[in-house]
Amino acid sequence: MPKIRRRVGKKSNHMKKSILFLLLACSIYSYGATAAKTQQVKRYAISETAMLNRFLDYVAIESASFYPTADEYPMTDGQKEMGDRLAADAKKLHADVTLSQWGYVYVNIPSNVKKQVPTIGVVCHMDITPETPSKGIKPTVLKYEGGIINLGNGIIDPNTPQGADLNNLIGKTLIHTDGTTILGGDDKNGCAILMSIIETVQKKGFKHGPLQFVFCPNEDVGLAALKIDTTYFNPDILIDVDLDGGQKVAVSNFTAEGLKVRFVGNDVHPAAAKELHLADALAAVSTYIARMPLQYRPENTEGKQGYIQAYQLEQLSDKVSYTIETRIRYFDKKEGDEFNRILRENLQYVRESFPYVKVEIMNEGLQYANVEYTMHPQSIPLIKAAATRCQIELDFEDLRAGTTAAMLSTKGLPGGMSLFSGQHNEHSVYEYSVLEEMYDAYILLLTMIDEIQK
């Protein structure tokens, strides 16, 4: 019996070694196959230097948008110049380009493979924020070696919130300003990435399905979707290139609704208030605000919890009437329904409690929607497969904000992921971009395009 055990043990050990060897061989083969697939894409890719030069050309164009009045379309000369430049660049690459009267630049690239595959659409925006100075942007390219970055007019310190990412960026190529303006990486990073993709897929031999691109104006004033033409841009899988950092992918976001209400008052002497029908609009609007449930205030929510916030109160010219604006944000549609019920009941209570105050809804409706509701089922598996090939570790997020893709969803377009683009400290004079993160986004998108046609 002991002899039998020894013989079985030797076979067992031999079998274990064989299995381990087989697993190791499979692992090496898998790694090699993945690397080979990635190299297939990279052999068509432009260089980091070419992307940097393109980016520097784009940030030299001051393309700030502005907040319009109700009766004007906010197209600026800088955005027109940027749109003209993008359209010209795409035409030089022999792409099918349309520059619309509203300033959108559409690029359509037909499939060059026989089988039917979903259309991938990629979007970014050409404007930069009007909230921070942007005249005379002076970019500096720096190979970061650690420590404080001297901008000339201020610093970026790794020990401050503005420098929180720097410790992970040693050895990377950073582009920053002189500290008096923004850089414009939000979203000139995206513009450079998209144009680099257009250049690459136009090269002979790069196989791809149908591709659509759009460079939007007015995103930073919340109007990227206002005049988009879905006859030119109507993809199955939508990707928005506008997130910060080098790993983030937003796969869901707040749905945003807004409500603006006017409370019309009538002032009389308090002694005769009952007889003369005092309409105390200030008391009415205060009651409306006070009845908002405290557990749904923004400061009491996190993660995928939504909120209600009455945020802007304005006294009108008659001094006795007021408008109040309320925002609601949610991920879950059921929570959104509950928030709307609360607001309706709240307004009804105010009407009954202040019968002489006229309560008028001036504006209400959807501002942007959670992309998760309508996202193509292949979107997330596709980006995961591409990330595996590129050996990029992604950080999937539920974004407590809106995105360009979320704005576009209100126009009937499918929900889209938002992808990192190498931006940091956007909307501030401490803004900087990271070239290697931009390049990672570019390679990842190319790999997605390659992956889906296979």
What are these regions (language model features)?
Residues 2, 10-18:
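Positively charged n-region of N-terminal signal peptides that target proteins for export
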Residues 18-26:
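Sec-dependent N-terminal signal peptides
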Residues 41, 46-77, 175-176, 424-428:
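N-terminal capping segment at the start of a domain
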Residues 68-127:
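A non-catalytic alpha/beta surface segment that caps or lines the substrate-entry region
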Residues 115-207, 215, 235, 440:
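Active-site metal-coordination/substrate-binding segment of hydrolases
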Residues 166, 172-182, 218-338, 348, ...:
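Midchain, well-structured core segments that form catalytic/ion-binding scaffolds
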Residues 283-300, 307-309, 358, 366-418:
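Active-site-adjacent substrate-binding region
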Residues 318, 394-447:
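Zn-dependent metallopeptidase/amidohydrolase metal-coordination segment
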